[in-house]
């Protein structure tokens, strides 16, 4: 294989490489054997057409595209490795020569990993705004939240207040004309929940069951239904029931209802205190790690971050987001219709985050390289076993999904993050 690389501009260039006849000939034979199985040529049994007759009738060149498709991926990968390049985006491939009996010549316009000039990344001083101490108020808030989850709604005769739930029928109209989606029956609405258009819930406060209220509201200018945005509407609203939240008493029985593993309220408080302490400690560690890495990134200089890297990160994030939605039964078209957004809006939403994440990844990789971090076979095996346990998979499944190089990369990244974080001090 002949390989050359020509820089065109920062982080961009043209990689030229060849695929030799030593590789082409056996692949031609393989492709021919596969193709001839489906050929029907008069005078020959199906699948038994001699190669010379095929070449004469169809031409050897008719096999070239299949041969190229088979050989190109490995040839490109080998050329990148031989040229010592770190390519960070899909190449633009051009086959410049496919002459019979000659080595094939291919060019690839590639984007390479930008140079990272590291600044200080060890012994950093960082600030974090996360409290480690668990207060009595923290414990009480946790218990109160669980207590409210066990609350029951009971019908009340008095007028509705914020925090109550009302059961209503409503019919909306604009200039006396009803509109789609503006009608509901026996709808349970929590007053103060913000479920409805701003101003709707407030106008029901002070009213009782059996009353009919004309609720006048204006749809927000950015409302998802453009035909309603900015318009004033009247909702004729009939209140059927007013319900108040009734919370259980704060006692040992409540504690047992919340958590069957405890016997008393004191036990529950102690359990929650330990859980909150562990959670706060974890949050504190995460905050220190985030602050230390952010500082290391700020101290570094990245020479012209390629747009392609950011685009690929945006694409990955968008696909991950939409994939999660689909697993919940929400397809992309439904999501965009509900939110009144577009695919482009979603890409723009992830743009800044993608740029930040790309810079962070580059700096951490540069730290790992500068420190000469590597991963032993023992460390790789331990990582595989840990991933298998985390995702409830067989070890062999993990090994099939992740290459040794991918695992080695992840391990060295973890080492770099640990170095940056463990040497940092909090102001």
UniProtKB/Swiss-Prot annotation:
Subcellular location(s) of the protein: Cytoplasm
InterPro entries: PPIase_dom_sf, PPIase_FKBP_dom, Trig_fac, Trigger_fac_C, Trigger_fac_C_sf, Trigger_fac_ribosome-bd_bac, Trigger_fac_ribosome-bd_sf, Trigger_fact/SurA_dom_sf
Pfam family, any one: FKBP_C
Domain notes: Consists of 3 domains; the N-terminus binds the ribosome, the middle domain has PPIase activity, while the C-terminus has intrinsic chaperone activity on its own.
Function comment: Involved in protein export. Acts as a chaperone by maintaining the newly synthesized protein in an open conformation. Functions as a peptidyl-prolyl cis-trans isomerase.
NCBIfam families xref list: tig
This protein's name: Trigger factor
Lineage: Bacteria, Bacillati, Bacillota, Bacilli, Lactobacillales
